Amino acid sequence: MFVKLLPPEVRKVIAAGEVIESPVDVVKELVENSLDAKATKVEVEIVKGGKRLIRVKDNGTGIHPEDVEKVVLQGATSKIETEKDLMNISTYGFRGEALYSISSVSKFKLRSRFFQEKEGKEIEVEAGNILGTRRVGMPVGTEVEVRDLFFNLPVRRKFLKKEDTERRKVLELIKEYALTNPEVEFTLFSEGRETLKLKKSSLKERVEEVFQTKTEELYAEREGITLRAFVSRNQRQGKYYVFINKRPIQNKNLKEFLRKVFGYKTLVVLYAELPPFMVDFNVHPKKKEVNILKERKFLELVRELAGKEKPIVDIPLSQPVKTYKPTYEILGQMDETFILVKDSEYLYFVDQHLLEERINYEKLKDENLACRISVKAGQKLSEEKIRELIKTWRNLENPHVCPHGRPIYYKIPLREIYEKVGRNY
């Protein structure tokens, strides 16, 4: 038998099948696009579990009208340009396959208004064939409508699960992305009814709202790896969620490891931040699998985190004020943005805005107001103000991250500094 190149239309369907297997895959790709577009509101609507209709609307930055026709082409992406870029991915999407794959196996319509334009542009595609484009009036953002998924692949359509099963999978997916994007409001409609509404909140509030339980917050960092976990013990059934650089990870081995170190009847929501070069998401077309460069050190830090019943604190940040004794030295302000603090082991670079934002949030419980009234980067502080901020920092309930989840400080071991210049510490 002679080897032949497959016709383009056949290759198109095969490629689409690697990325899109069910309605939840469509929702995943579209929600990721919305988040990459900096949306603060994402609305998802499904009918018949997504088999009949999937619609995703957002208020993100939108797509430039010149790019609307490009986004449904294979390999069309604004995220990467070279192979090296694959090692520094900071967005959800990067392959340039999602909209191409979805539009190849559905009746597809996309309308988007770029934030610098006065009107939007709509494109309609059926089974990969562009039917036409037109100008439309709409707010800034993007709306994608996917009808009759796999209408041109009847065999694939037969393998879809029952509507209730597909609906539950979509609901679970929305919760996962809501868990790692608390600053975004998520709404899910099914059969015309609102089934989920999550308004923007702090990360801890979002976790507790999704799971309807109080949690204990844990924190650890080492060698560029930052871990933050929310744990609730004595659950009827253990649940384990892992997010690496804000991306949900489906890894059975890692979840089994969490079961062993945290316990089998524990809710664990683990957030890991790693430098992009340490993580390879380009393992599987669905980006669900991941390779970690320093996996052993990562797991060691997770084990250490699990052994803590209270948040890990590297310096005594939670001493009662009346027994307060300085164990640190304030070195001054750097670039009118960071406060430099040194203790017996570390040099800390403390972000002055994020620190006061956390202080104000713990007083007011309003993250937006806390942000607005806090000192800004680029603002020169008096010595008295610096002392006040650092003293309060040491007594915060959560001294590690701001209400939006950004780290308040970065620390360098003093031993490492001395070793770099060839001195003993």
Swiss-Prot record:
Gene Ontology molecular function terms on file: ATP binding; ATP hydrolysis activity; ATP-dependent DNA damage sensor activity; mismatched DNA binding
Keyword annotations: DNA damage, DNA repair
Superkingdom, taxonomy of origin: Bacteria
SMART domains the record matches: DNA_mis_repair
Biological process (GO), any one: mismatch repair
CDD domains in UniProt: HATPase_MutL-MLH-PMS-like, MutL_Trans
A GO CC annotation given for this chain: mismatch repair complex
Matching SUPFAM superfamilies: ATPase domain of HSP90 chaperone/DNA topoisomerase II/histidine kinase (SSF55874), DNA mismatch repair protein MutL (SSF118116), Ribosomal protein S5 domain 2-like (SSF54211)
InterPro entries given in the database record: DNA_mismatch_repair_CS, DNA_mismatch_repair_MutL, DNA_mismatch_S5_2-like, HATPase_C_sf, MutL/Mlh/PMS, MutL/Mlh/Pms-like, MutL_C, MutL_C_dimsub
Pfam families referenced in this protein's UniProt entry, alphabetically: DNA_mis_repair, HATPase_c_3, MutL_C
Gene3D superfamilies from the UniProt entry: 3.30.230.10, Histidine kinase-like ATPase, C-terminal domain, MutL, C-terminal domain, dimerisation subdomain
Function, in words: This protein is involved in the repair of mismatches in DNA. It is required for dam-dependent methyl-directed DNA mismatch repair. May act as a 'molecular matchmaker', a protein that promotes the formation of a stable complex between two or more DNA-binding proteins in an ATP-dependent manner without itself being part of a final effector complex.
HAMAP family according to UniProt: DNA_mis_repair
Family to which the UniProt record says this protein belongs: Belongs to the DNA mismatch repair MutL/HexB family.
Protein name: DNA mismatch repair protein MutL
Species: Aquifex aeolicus (strain VF5)
